[in-house]
UniProtKB/Swiss-Prot annotation:
It holds the Pfam family SMC_ScpB. Belongs to the ScpB family. It comes from the Bacteria. Its main location: cytoplasm. The keyword RNA-binding does not apply. It is found in: Cytoplasm. InterPro entries: ScpB_csome_segregation (IPR005234), WH-like_DNA-bd_sf (IPR036388), WH_DNA-bd_sf (IPR036390). SUPFAM superfamilies: Winged helix' DNA-binding domain (SSF46785). The keyword Transmembrane does not apply. Homodimer. Homodimerization may be required to stabilize the binding of ScpA to the Smc head domains. Component of a cohesin-like complex composed of ScpA, ScpB and the Smc homodimer, in which ScpA and ScpB bind to the head domain of Smc. The presence of the three proteins is required for the association of the complex with DNA. This is Segregation and condensation protein B. GO terms for cellular component: cytoplasm.
Length: 197
C-alpha cells in the first residue's frame, strides 16, 4: 500500500510538472488518474503536505479549481534575478483597468472608460492578449457590448485562489465622482500587486 501511495505521488508530480504554468484541473487529474474526487483530494492533500514538510524549492498550489507546482515565495528573490527584464511589469493604465474589471466584472468597455475618464480599448485588448482578461458574455441592450472579466491566469499571476481574496474596498467612501472611484480601485489593486511582486 505504501508503494502505491509513493507511485501516485510521483505520477501527480510528473503530471503537474509536464503541465507547467497552466496546471491541471481536478477534472483532468481525475480522468488521467482514474480516481473519484474524494480520492483525488486526499492524494493532493498528502502531496501538498509532503512539499511543506520537506525543504523543497517548490510547492503545490490550488487555484480556481486547478492545481500547479510553483516555486516557494522564499526563493522568489533568486528567480527574480534570473528572469528579471526591463518593462516586464504592467503599465499604470493596465493596472487601473485590471482593478476596475476585477472588482466590477462583468463590465463593458464603456463602463470601464466612464470610471477611468479616458479611452481604454487598447489597454483592454492588451490585457486580453496577455490572458489576464477575457470576454465573459454580452450586455443586454443596443449593440450587445462585450462584457469583460478576469481569467484563471489573472488569479495565478496575482497569487489568488478566487476573486473573494481581493482586498475589500472601504464601505464608507462617498462617491464624489468617477475619478475618486478610479483612484480607489487603483490604490487597492496596486497595493495587492506590490505585495505579490
Amino acid at each position: 500500500m505504501t508503494l502505491d501511495i509513493v507511485n501516485w505521488k510521483a505520477i501527480i508530480e510528473a503530471l503537474l510538472y509536464a503541465a507547467g504554468d497552466e496546471g491541471l484541473t481536478k477534472k483532468q487529474l481525475m480522468s488521467v488518474l482514474e480516481v473519484e474526487e474524494v480520492a483525488l483530494l486526499d492524494m493532493m492533500s498528502a502531496v501538498k503536505e509532503e512539499y511543506q514538510k520537506q525543504e523543497r524549492g517548490i510547492e503545490l498550489i490550488e487555484y480556481a479549481d486547478s492545481y500547479m507546482l510553483l516555486t516557494k515565495k522564499e526563493y522568489s528573490i533568486y528567480l527574480k534575478k534570473l528572469v528579471e527584464t526591463p518593462s516586464k511589469g504592467l503599465s499604470q493604465a493596465a493596472l487601473e483597468v485590471l482593478a476596475i474589471v476585477s472588482y466590477k466584472q462583468p463590465i463593458t468597455r464603456s463602463e470601464v472608460e466612464e470610471i477611468r475618464g479616458v479611452k481604454s480599448e487598447r489597454v483592454l485588448h492588451s490585457l486580453v492578449a496577455k490572458a489576464l482578461l477575457c470576454e465573459v458574455g454580452r450586455a443586454d441592450g443596443p449593440g450587445r457590448a462585450i462584457l469583460y472579466g478576469t481569467t484563471p491566469t489573472f488569479l495565478e499571476q496575482f497569487g489568488l485562489k478566487a476573486l473573494d481574496e481581493l482586498p475589500p474596498l472601504p464601505e464608507n467612501v462617498e462617491a464624489d465622482g468617477v475619478q475618486e472611484e478610479a483612484d480607489l480601485f487603483f490604490e487597492n489593486f496596486n497595493q495587492t500587486f506590490e505585495e505579490i511582486k
